[in-house]
Curated annotation (Swiss-Prot):
Protein source organism: Dama dama (Fallow deer)
Lipid attachment, kind S-palmitoyl cysteine: C315
Taxonomy of the source species: Eukaryota, Metazoa, Chordata, Craniata, Vertebrata
Residues with glycosylation annotation: N29
Signal sequence, renumbered to the chain: none
Descriptive protein name: Melanocyte-stimulating hormone receptor
Entry keyword annotation includes GTP-binding: no
Any one GO MF annotation of this record: melanocyte-stimulating hormone receptor activity
Gene name tied to this protein: MC1R
Subcellular location: Cell membrane
Subunit structure: Interacts with MGRN1, but does not undergo MGRN1-mediated ubiquitination; this interaction competes with GNAS-binding and thus inhibits agonist-induced cAMP production. Interacts with OPN3; the interaction results in a decrease in MC1R-mediated cAMP signaling and ultimately a decrease in melanin production in melanocytes.
UniProt key word Nucleus: no
GO cellular component: plasma membrane
Membrane topology reported for the UniProt record: Multi-pass membrane protein
Membrane-spanning segments: 38-63, 73-93, 119-140, 164-183, 192-211, 241-266, 280-300
Protein backbone atom coordinates (compact mmCIF):
# COMPACT_ATOMS: atom_id res chain seq x y z
CA UNK A 1 0.00 0.00 0.00
CA UNK A 2 1.43 3.38 -0.93
CA UNK A 3 2.34 4.89 2.42
CA UNK A 4 5.48 6.30 3.94
CA UNK A 5 7.84 4.36 6.10
CA UNK A 6 8.68 0.69 6.34
CA UNK A 7 6.19 -1.26 4.31
CA UNK A 8 5.63 -4.59 2.62
CA UNK A 9 5.92 -3.90 -1.10
CA UNK A 10 6.73 -6.39 -3.84
CA UNK A 11 9.16 -4.06 -5.61
CA UNK A 12 11.31 -4.04 -2.51
CA UNK A 13 11.76 -7.80 -2.92
CA UNK A 14 13.64 -7.32 -6.18
CA UNK A 15 16.42 -5.70 -4.15
CA UNK A 16 15.85 -7.59 -0.92
CA UNK A 17 18.01 -7.42 2.17
CA UNK A 18 18.28 -10.11 4.86
CA UNK A 19 15.49 -9.90 7.43
CA UNK A 20 16.16 -8.75 10.96
CA UNK A 21 17.34 -11.46 13.33
CA UNK A 22 15.21 -10.29 16.24
CA UNK A 23 11.54 -9.36 16.03
CA UNK A 24 11.96 -6.36 18.33
CA UNK A 25 14.73 -3.87 17.53
CA UNK A 26 15.68 -0.30 18.26
CA UNK A 27 15.95 1.54 14.98
CA UNK A 28 18.36 4.49 15.12
CA UNK A 29 16.91 7.90 14.39
CA UNK A 30 19.50 10.43 13.30
CA UNK A 31 17.58 13.48 14.49
CA UNK A 32 15.93 12.14 17.60
CA UNK A 33 15.80 9.30 20.12
CA UNK A 34 15.97 5.65 19.19
CA UNK A 35 12.81 4.13 17.71
CA UNK A 36 11.17 0.94 18.88
CA UNK A 37 10.54 -1.06 15.72
CA UNK A 38 8.62 -4.34 15.76
CA UNK A 39 9.59 -6.58 12.86
CA UNK A 40 6.85 -8.95 11.70
CA UNK A 41 8.28 -12.08 10.04
CA UNK A 42 6.78 -13.14 6.72
CA UNK A 43 5.94 -16.50 8.28
CA UNK A 44 3.73 -14.78 10.84
CA UNK A 45 1.94 -12.85 8.09
CA UNK A 46 1.30 -16.13 6.28
CA UNK A 47 0.08 -17.86 9.43
CA UNK A 48 -2.30 -15.05 10.40
CA UNK A 49 -3.60 -14.80 6.84
CA UNK A 50 -4.23 -18.54 6.57
CA UNK A 51 -6.04 -18.70 9.93
CA UNK A 52 -8.26 -15.79 8.91
CA UNK A 53 -8.79 -17.38 5.50
CA UNK A 54 -10.03 -20.67 6.99
CA UNK A 55 -12.26 -18.95 9.58
CA UNK A 56 -14.00 -16.67 7.12
CA UNK A 57 -14.42 -19.39 4.48
CA UNK A 58 -16.22 -21.46 7.12
CA UNK A 59 -18.51 -18.53 7.97
CA UNK A 60 -19.42 -17.98 4.31
CA UNK A 61 -19.97 -21.72 3.76
CA UNK A 62 -22.17 -22.07 6.86
CA UNK A 63 -24.39 -19.11 5.90
CA UNK A 64 -24.66 -20.34 2.31
CA UNK A 65 -25.63 -23.85 3.46
CA UNK A 66 -28.35 -23.01 6.00
CA UNK A 67 -31.49 -21.39 4.56
CA UNK A 68 -32.47 -20.26 8.05
CA UNK A 69 -29.47 -17.93 7.90
CA UNK A 70 -30.58 -16.31 4.63
CA UNK A 71 -31.65 -13.07 6.29
CA UNK A 72 -30.34 -9.49 6.02
CA UNK A 73 -28.44 -9.73 9.31
CA UNK A 74 -26.56 -12.86 8.28
CA UNK A 75 -25.98 -11.53 4.77
CA UNK A 76 -24.20 -8.54 6.33
CA UNK A 77 -22.15 -10.94 8.47
CA UNK A 78 -21.40 -13.02 5.37
CA UNK A 79 -20.21 -9.93 3.48
CA UNK A 80 -18.06 -8.93 6.45
CA UNK A 81 -16.51 -12.40 6.30
CA UNK A 82 -15.92 -11.98 2.56
CA UNK A 83 -14.24 -8.61 3.17
CA UNK A 84 -12.00 -10.14 5.83
CA UNK A 85 -11.39 -13.01 3.42
CA UNK A 86 -10.09 -10.55 0.82
CA UNK A 87 -7.83 -8.94 3.44
CA UNK A 88 -6.37 -12.38 4.16
CA UNK A 89 -6.05 -13.45 0.52
CA UNK A 90 -4.34 -10.23 -0.54
CA UNK A 91 -1.81 -10.39 2.29
CA UNK A 92 -1.13 -14.10 1.82
CA UNK A 93 -0.67 -13.53 -1.92
CA UNK A 94 1.68 -10.58 -1.38
CA UNK A 95 3.74 -12.44 1.22
CA UNK A 96 3.99 -15.57 -0.94
CA UNK A 97 5.13 -13.60 -4.00
CA UNK A 98 7.65 -11.65 -1.89
CA UNK A 99 9.12 -14.88 -0.52
CA UNK A 100 9.36 -16.39 -4.01
CA UNK A 101 11.07 -13.26 -5.34
CA UNK A 102 13.51 -13.15 -2.44
CA UNK A 103 14.36 -16.83 -2.88
CA UNK A 104 14.87 -16.39 -6.62
CA UNK A 105 12.19 -19.00 -7.36
CA UNK A 106 10.12 -16.47 -9.29
CA UNK A 107 11.62 -14.37 -12.06
CA UNK A 108 9.64 -11.30 -12.98
CA UNK A 109 10.30 -7.92 -14.54
CA UNK A 110 9.83 -4.79 -12.47
CA UNK A 111 6.88 -3.68 -14.61
CA UNK A 112 5.04 -6.97 -14.02
CA UNK A 113 5.72 -6.83 -10.30
CA UNK A 114 4.49 -3.22 -10.23
CA UNK A 115 1.18 -4.23 -11.84
CA UNK A 116 0.77 -7.13 -9.42
CA UNK A 117 1.55 -4.83 -6.51
CA UNK A 118 -1.11 -2.36 -7.69
CA UNK A 119 -3.70 -5.15 -7.95
CA UNK A 120 -2.90 -6.35 -4.43
CA UNK A 121 -3.07 -2.78 -3.12
CA UNK A 122 -6.53 -2.36 -4.67
CA UNK A 123 -7.63 -5.63 -3.03
CA UNK A 124 -6.27 -4.60 0.37
CA UNK A 125 -7.72 -1.09 0.30
CA UNK A 126 -11.10 -2.21 -1.08
CA UNK A 127 -11.43 -5.00 1.47
CA UNK A 128 -10.56 -2.62 4.32
CA UNK A 129 -13.19 -0.08 3.25
CA UNK A 130 -15.85 -2.76 2.73
CA UNK A 131 -15.01 -4.36 6.08
CA UNK A 132 -15.53 -1.04 7.88
CA UNK A 133 -18.77 -0.45 5.97
CA UNK A 134 -20.21 -3.85 6.86
CA UNK A 135 -19.24 -3.41 10.52
CA UNK A 136 -21.30 -0.21 10.44
CA UNK A 137 -24.14 -1.95 8.58
CA UNK A 138 -24.27 -4.71 11.22
CA UNK A 139 -24.45 -2.08 13.98
CA UNK A 140 -27.31 -0.26 12.22
CA UNK A 141 -29.14 -3.55 11.61
CA UNK A 142 -28.91 -4.51 15.28
CA UNK A 143 -30.03 -1.04 16.33
CA UNK A 144 -33.14 -1.22 14.15
CA UNK A 145 -33.93 -4.74 15.41
CA UNK A 146 -33.93 -3.46 19.01
CA UNK A 147 -35.54 -0.02 18.75
CA UNK A 148 -37.95 -0.77 15.90
CA UNK A 149 -38.59 -4.46 16.54
CA UNK A 150 -42.21 -4.45 15.31
CA UNK A 151 -41.28 -2.70 12.07
CA UNK A 152 -37.93 -4.43 11.55
CA UNK A 153 -39.04 -6.83 8.81
CA UNK A 154 -40.75 -4.05 6.89
CA UNK A 155 -37.75 -1.71 7.22
CA UNK A 156 -34.89 -4.17 6.69
CA UNK A 157 -36.13 -6.17 3.71
CA UNK A 158 -34.05 -8.47 1.54
CA UNK A 159 -34.21 -6.17 -1.53
CA UNK A 160 -33.03 -3.23 0.57
CA UNK A 161 -30.29 -5.32 2.12
CA UNK A 162 -29.09 -6.43 -1.32
CA UNK A 163 -29.06 -2.81 -2.54
CA UNK A 164 -27.03 -1.76 0.50
CA UNK A 165 -24.61 -4.63 -0.01
CA UNK A 166 -24.18 -3.80 -3.71
CA UNK A 167 -23.66 -0.11 -2.92
CA UNK A 168 -20.99 -0.94 -0.33
CA UNK A 169 -19.05 -3.18 -2.72
CA UNK A 170 -19.21 -0.65 -5.56
CA UNK A 171 -18.17 2.19 -3.24
CA UNK A 172 -15.31 0.08 -1.87
CA UNK A 173 -13.97 -0.69 -5.34
CA UNK A 174 -14.18 2.96 -6.44
CA UNK A 175 -12.58 4.14 -3.20
CA UNK A 176 -9.68 1.70 -3.54
CA UNK A 177 -9.06 2.78 -7.14
CA UNK A 178 -9.10 6.45 -6.15
CA UNK A 179 -6.81 5.80 -3.20
CA UNK A 180 -4.25 3.90 -5.28
CA UNK A 181 -4.36 6.57 -8.01
CA UNK A 182 -4.26 9.65 -5.75
CA UNK A 183 -2.59 8.26 -2.64
CA UNK A 184 -0.13 11.17 -2.51
CA UNK A 185 -2.95 13.72 -2.18
CA UNK A 186 -3.63 14.91 1.37
CA UNK A 187 -7.39 15.10 0.80
CA UNK A 188 -7.59 11.38 -0.02
CA UNK A 189 -5.80 10.38 3.18
CA UNK A 190 -7.91 12.74 5.26
CA UNK A 191 -11.09 11.30 3.74
CA UNK A 192 -10.02 7.77 4.71
CA UNK A 193 -9.18 8.86 8.25
CA UNK A 194 -12.46 10.77 8.50
CA UNK A 195 -14.33 7.68 7.29
CA UNK A 196 -12.74 5.56 10.02
CA UNK A 197 -13.61 8.14 12.70
CA UNK A 198 -17.19 8.31 11.40
CA UNK A 199 -17.54 4.51 11.56
CA UNK A 200 -16.06 4.43 15.06
CA UNK A 201 -18.42 7.17 16.24
CA UNK A 202 -21.42 5.49 14.59
CA UNK A 203 -20.70 2.13 16.22
CA UNK A 204 -20.00 3.72 19.62
CA UNK A 205 -23.23 5.76 19.63
CA UNK A 206 -25.42 2.88 18.43
CA UNK A 207 -23.99 0.21 20.72
CA UNK A 208 -23.97 2.48 23.79
CA UNK A 209 -27.61 3.38 23.10
CA UNK A 210 -28.44 -0.33 22.70
CA UNK A 211 -26.70 -1.11 26.00
CA UNK A 212 -28.66 1.66 27.74
CA UNK A 213 -31.95 0.28 26.37
CA UNK A 214 -31.01 -3.26 27.44
CA UNK A 215 -30.19 -2.07 30.97
CA UNK A 216 -33.48 -0.17 31.11
CA UNK A 217 -35.32 -3.31 30.03
CA UNK A 218 -33.48 -5.34 32.68
CA UNK A 219 -34.49 -2.84 35.36
CA UNK A 220 -38.13 -3.18 34.31
CA UNK A 221 -37.95 -6.96 34.63
CA UNK A 222 -36.20 -6.63 37.99
CA UNK A 223 -38.95 -4.41 39.36
CA UNK A 224 -41.56 -6.97 38.39
CA UNK A 225 -39.60 -9.73 40.06
CA UNK A 226 -38.57 -7.53 43.03
CA UNK A 227 -34.92 -8.42 42.53
CA UNK A 228 -33.73 -5.18 41.04
CA UNK A 229 -30.12 -4.97 42.16
CA UNK A 230 -28.69 -8.42 41.31
CA UNK A 231 -30.30 -8.65 37.88
CA UNK A 232 -29.55 -5.10 36.84
CA UNK A 233 -25.94 -5.13 38.01
CA UNK A 234 -25.20 -8.52 36.49
CA UNK A 235 -26.78 -7.66 33.16
CA UNK A 236 -25.16 -4.22 33.09
CA UNK A 237 -21.69 -5.61 33.75
CA UNK A 238 -22.11 -8.29 31.10
CA UNK A 239 -23.37 -5.78 28.55
CA UNK A 240 -20.59 -3.31 29.36
CA UNK A 241 -17.99 -6.05 28.99
CA UNK A 242 -19.41 -7.08 25.61
CA UNK A 243 -19.47 -3.46 24.45
CA UNK A 244 -15.89 -2.90 25.64
CA UNK A 245 -14.67 -5.97 23.77
CA UNK A 246 -16.53 -5.07 20.59
CA UNK A 247 -15.42 -1.43 20.39
CA UNK A 248 -12.01 -2.14 21.93
CA UNK A 249 -11.10 -4.75 19.33
CA UNK A 250 -12.29 -2.45 16.55
CA UNK A 251 -10.24 0.50 17.82
CA UNK A 252 -7.08 -1.45 18.70
CA UNK A 253 -6.96 -3.31 15.38
CA UNK A 254 -7.86 -0.44 13.05
CA UNK A 255 -6.73 2.63 15.03
CA UNK A 256 -2.94 2.30 14.55
CA UNK A 257 -3.27 2.01 10.76
CA UNK A 258 -5.37 5.16 10.51
CA UNK A 259 -3.08 6.92 12.98
CA UNK A 260 -0.31 6.09 10.52
CA UNK A 261 -2.28 7.74 7.70
CA UNK A 262 -3.02 10.78 9.87
CA UNK A 263 0.64 11.30 10.73
CA UNK A 264 1.59 11.13 7.05
CA UNK A 265 -0.47 14.31 6.66
CA UNK A 266 0.37 15.98 9.97
CA UNK A 267 4.09 15.31 10.47
CA UNK A 268 5.69 13.37 7.59
CA UNK A 269 9.22 14.60 8.44
CA UNK A 270 9.07 14.65 12.24
CA UNK A 271 11.44 12.13 13.93
CA UNK A 272 8.77 10.87 16.34
CA UNK A 273 6.32 10.28 13.51
CA UNK A 274 9.12 8.55 11.61
CA UNK A 275 9.37 6.05 14.47
CA UNK A 276 5.67 5.25 14.07
CA UNK A 277 6.04 4.88 10.29
CA UNK A 278 8.62 2.14 10.86
CA UNK A 279 5.93 -0.07 12.43
CA UNK A 280 3.58 -0.12 9.44
CA UNK A 281 3.94 -3.91 9.18
CA UNK A 282 2.69 -4.25 12.76
CA UNK A 283 -0.36 -2.12 11.96
CA UNK A 284 -1.13 -4.28 8.94
CA UNK A 285 -0.78 -7.42 11.07
CA UNK A 286 -3.31 -5.98 13.54
CA UNK A 287 -5.83 -5.58 10.71
CA UNK A 288 -5.33 -9.24 9.82
CA UNK A 289 -5.87 -10.08 13.50
CA UNK A 290 -9.15 -8.18 13.29
CA UNK A 291 -10.13 -10.43 10.39
CA UNK A 292 -9.50 -13.38 12.72
CA UNK A 293 -11.48 -11.91 15.63
CA UNK A 294 -14.50 -10.70 13.61
CA UNK A 295 -15.99 -14.22 13.14
CA UNK A 296 -15.66 -14.85 16.88
CA UNK A 297 -17.57 -11.66 17.72
CA UNK A 298 -20.21 -11.51 15.00
CA UNK A 299 -20.66 -15.04 13.61
CA UNK A 300 -19.68 -17.85 15.96
CA UNK A 301 -21.79 -16.48 18.83
CA UNK A 302 -24.89 -17.56 16.89
CA UNK A 303 -26.05 -21.00 18.00
CA UNK A 304 -27.68 -21.66 14.62
CA UNK A 305 -24.49 -20.78 12.76
CA UNK A 306 -22.34 -22.89 15.09
CA UNK A 307 -24.63 -25.87 14.50
CA UNK A 308 -24.39 -25.39 10.73
CA UNK A 309 -20.63 -25.01 11.01
CA UNK A 310 -20.41 -28.40 12.72
CA UNK A 311 -22.37 -29.91 9.84
CA UNK A 312 -20.04 -28.29 7.31
CA UNK A 313 -16.98 -29.64 9.10
CA UNK A 314 -18.50 -33.13 9.35
CA UNK A 315 -19.31 -33.11 5.63
CA UNK A 316 -15.75 -32.02 4.80
CA UNK A 317 -14.41 -35.06 6.63
Amino acid sequence: MPVLGSQRRLLGSLNCTPPATFPLTLAPNRTGPQCLEVSIPDGLFLSLGLVSLVENVLVVAAIAKNRNLHSPMYYFICCLAMSDLLVSVSNVLETAVMLLLEAGALAAQAAVVQQLDNVIDVLICGSMVSSLCFLGAIAVDRYISIFYALRYHSVVTLPRAWRIIAAIWVASILTSLLFITYYNHTVVLLCLVGFFIAMLALMAVLYVHMLARACQHARGIARLQKRQRPIHQGFGLKGAATLTILLGVFFLCWGPFFLHLSLIVLCPQHPTCGCIFKNFNLFLALIICNAIVDPLIYAFRSQELRKTLQEVLQCSW
